[in-house]
From Swiss-Prot:
Keywords: Amino-acid biosynthesis, ATP-binding, Cytoplasm, Kinase, Nucleotide-binding, Proline biosynthesis, Transferase. Its EC number is 2.7.2.11. Catalyzes the transfer of a phosphate group to glutamate to form L-glutamate 5-phosphate. SUPFAM superfamilies: Carbamate kinase-like, PUA domain-like. ATP binds at residues 17, 176-177, 217-223. This is Glutamate 5-kinase. PANTHER family: GLUTAMATE 5-KINASE (PTHR43654), ISOPENTENYL PHOSPHATE KINASE (PTHR43654:SF1).
């Protein structure tokens, strides 16, 4: 077994993401017995001493039948109505399944806005940490009943990657209806090549991923990008079929493993790079791009050539090169109006109170 699979097998804290297709029948009906079998596999891992946080899809699918709908709704209002009904059934099913083992569950509903705002981000982290300390199983889902298109994660694959870093998980396991990554859809192409490990971009050469199913939103494109996000932040990922959950959670010998970068990204840098909303941008000259990206130095006003957006000191902004390509994100020290007057001027030309870096190196992350 590879060292990357060993890392997942030995992890003492996991985030397990369960996709909609793992909880529904072939006809799209929510199936609580499938969920119960997944809980059996998860409980075995927990009994061995591993902390587990679950990110569960399926709320909208679980609400389809009770509302008399024949297909997954397409309009936002009906999706949210289905989610509000289905979330009750979903959490009750998780609760009943874990109650067989004497475990309580806690529901945590998040929106992208909860993660993008630093205070809410920290509060979510504390809640999840406290649930684990109290030996309750956190069941996390996107809050579909209030999330709009503008403040959505988009799917629970990305949410699971964010949660994995949020709780300091040592590994992320994505359980779906397919047994790993292929270079094309194996359901449509019998000659599709299985990819057992992803340790670099070369392993993804020729991979053509599919979009989501009719019941869920996260297709292979989503799973692959979310796995790469988590791995880039230092969290190894296993993508496997829900039918193989027991094996995946026991020894990680199935599915596709995504190797993590050796140095785990700090919580603040992860938030800056992947979770925080940016509210403006600064355009840099080539010298400033080199200093920020290659030398990891603070951004000074002298290297700024343009200021865009309405922002204030403490907001997150994008840093863009002369060709408009984003090269970094960071917390800006000044308001947009102040920077517009300061840009292009050397530190010695500025009043003493404006000689701090525009964006300090400690508040920067390269893209």
């Amino acid at each position: 077994m590879s060292v990357h699979r060993d890392a997942i097998r030995a992890a003492r804290s996991l985030v397990v993401k369960v996709g909609t297709n793992a909880l529904t029948t072939s006809s799209g009906v929510f199936d609580s017995s499938r969920l119960a079998r997944l809980v059996d596999a998860i409980e075995a891992r927990m009994k061995a001493g591993t902390d587990v946080v679950i990110v569960s899809s399926g709320a909208i699918a679980a609400g389809i039948e009770p509302l008399g709908l024949s297909l997954r709704p397409k309009d936002l209002a009906t999706k949210q109505a289905a989610a509000s009904v289905g979330q009750v059934a979903l959490v009750n099913s998780w609760s009943a399944a874990f109650a067989r083992y004497g475990r309580a569950v806690g529901q945590v509903l998040l929106t992208a806005q909860d993660i993008s705002m630093r205070v809410q981000h920290t509060n979510a982290q504390r809640t999840l940490d406290r649930l684990r300390a109290l030996h309750a199983v956190a069941i996390v889902n996107e809050n579909d009943t209030v999330a709009t298109n503008e403040i959505r994660f988009g799917d629970n694959d990305r949410l699971s990657a964010v949660v994995a870093h949020l709780v300091g998980a040592e590994a992320l396991v994505l359980l779906s209806d397919i047994n790993g990554l292929y270079d094309s859809d194996p359901r449509k192409n019998t000659g599709a090549r299985f990819v057992p490990e992803v340790t670099g971009s070369a392993d993804l050469d020729g991979v053509v991923a599919s979009r989501g199913s009719s019941l869920g939103t996260g297709g292979m494109v989503s799973k692959m990008s979310s796995a790469l996000l988590a791995a880039d932040a230092g969290v190894p990922v296993l993508l496997a079929a829900a039918a193989d959950a027991a094996t995946a959670l026991t020894d990680a010998s199935v599915g596709t493993v995504f190797a993590a970068r050796p140095d785990r990204m700090s919580a603040r840098r992860f938030w800056l790079r992947y979770a925080a909303d940016s509210v403006g941008s600064l355009t840099l000259d080539e010298g400033a791009v080199w200093a920020v990206v290659q030398q990891r130095r603070s951004l000074l006003a002298a290297g700024i050539t343009a200021v865009s957006g309405r922002f204030y000191g403490g907001d997150v902004v994008e840093l863009r090169g002369p060709d408009a390509t984003m090269v970094a994100r960071g917390v800006v020290a000044y308001d947009a109006t102040e920077l517009a007057a300061m840009m292009g001027r050397s530190t010695s030309e500025l009043p003493c109170e404006l000689r701090r870096p525009a964006v300090h190196a400690d508040d920067l992350v390269s893209i």
